[in-house]
């Protein structure tokens, strides 16, 4: 059971790392927590194959335009018996902006599938599905600079 708790804690840490990258608008740093051949659904592209496409179509259309991205504490995860795959689900909150700069709440949800070569290795996301709750505007209009490394 100790391995299961460690694995779920590692899934939670992955979500926190993603939040750090979103806050910093750190696309380069975020690449390391996603599989190169990932598949994804998102707000700005119905179906994406590849981390580079997810970054171009999704991350760059969201991260620089929102503030205060955070996960709610109740992150859920299930881990396979061999401890090599997992699925995590979480609810997020962030602040979006109308074209005139008025802030609005921007809640949503995420399901992330993870993989790794051996137990104890960091999780890599090989599938993400992030979506806003109903009636939340999809486009936020703030602009922040990308982190330069």
Predicted segment positions?
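Short beta-strand edge/turn micro-motifs at domain boundaries
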Residues: 107-142
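Short, cysteine-centered beta-strand-loop-beta hairpins and adjacent loop/turn segments enriched
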Residues: 65-66, 94-105, 134
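Glycine-rich beta-strand-turn "strand-cap" elements at beta-sheet edges
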Residues: 74-81, 130-134, 142-148
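Short solvent-exposed loop/turn micro-motifs enriched in small/polar/acidic residues
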Residues: 13, 70-72, 107
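A short, structured loop/turn motif at beta-sheet edges
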Residues: 78-87, 102, 114-124
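Hydrophobic/aromatic beta-strand elements that line small-molecule binding cavities or substrate pockets
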Residues: 58-59, 73-79, 92-94, 109-116, ...
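Short, low-complexity N-terminal intrinsically disordered segments enriched in polar/charged residues
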Residues: 1-36, 143-149
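A solvent-exposed, acidic/Ser-Thr-rich amphipathic alpha-helical stretch
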Residues: 27-84, 90
């Amino acid at each position: 059971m100790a391995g299961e708790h460690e694995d779920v804690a590692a899934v939670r840490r992955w979500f926190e790392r993603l939040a750090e990258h979103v806050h910093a608008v750190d696309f380069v740093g975020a690449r390391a927590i996603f599989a190169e051949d990932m598949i994804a659904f998102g707000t700005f592209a119905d179906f994406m194959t590849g981390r580079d496409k997810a970054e171009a179509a999704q991350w760059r259309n969201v991260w620089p335009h929102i503030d205060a991205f955070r996960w709610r504490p109740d992150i859920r995860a299930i881990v396979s018996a061999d401890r090599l795959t997992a699925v995590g689900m979480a609810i997020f909150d962030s602040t979006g902006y109308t074209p005139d700069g008025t802030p609005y709440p921007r809640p949503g949800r995420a399901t992330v599938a993870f993989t790794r070569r051996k137990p104890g290795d960091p999780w890599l996301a090989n599938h993400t599905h992030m979506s806003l709750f109903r009636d939340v505007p999809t486009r936020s209009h703030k602009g922040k600079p990308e982190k330069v490394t």
